[in-house]
Amino acid sequence: MVVRSILLFIVAAVAEIGGAWLVWQGVREQRGLAWIGAGVIALGLYGFVATLQPDAHFGRILAAYGGIFVAGSLLWGMAFDGFRPDRADIVGALVCLAGVGVIMYAPRAH
C-alpha cells in the first residue's frame, strides 16, 4: 500500500506541477491558450488522482501531498526551467518529505 500511495503522489505531482507550469507558460511566456487549456486539464487530473489514495482522510492526503509538492516543484524547476536549488531549498524539501513520511506512514491506532 505504501508503494501505491507514493506512486499516486508522484502522478499527482506531475499533474499539478505540470499543469501549473503549462498555465505559467501560456500566460507569462505568452505561449497561448492551448498551453493554458492543457494546464487546466492537468490540474483537474491532479484533483482526481488524489481521490485514489488508499487513506480515506482528505486532510491527511492533502497535507502530506503538500510536502511532495514542495520537493516536486524544485525538481520540476531544475528539469524544465534551469532552476538550481540552494542548500536551504534542499534542506527545506527534505524536511517536507520527512513530514510526508510521518503524516502518511506512521503507525496509528485505528
Swiss-Prot record:
Domain of life, per lineage: Bacteria
Broad class of the protein's primary localization: membrane
Membrane topology, record value: Multi-pass membrane protein
Any single Gene Ontology cellular-component annotation: plasma membrane
Keyword annotations: Cell membrane, Membrane, Transmembrane, Transmembrane helix
Pfam families reported for this sequence: UPF0060
Record's subcellular location: Cell membrane
Transmembrane segments: 6-26, 32-52, 61-81, 90-110
Record bears the keyword Thylakoid: no
Record PANTHER family: UPF0060 MEMBRANE PROTEIN YNFA
Stated family: Belongs to the UPF0060 family.
Official protein name in the record: UPF0060 membrane protein MMAR_2961
Annotated organism of origin: Mycobacterium marinum (strain ATCC BAA-535 / M)
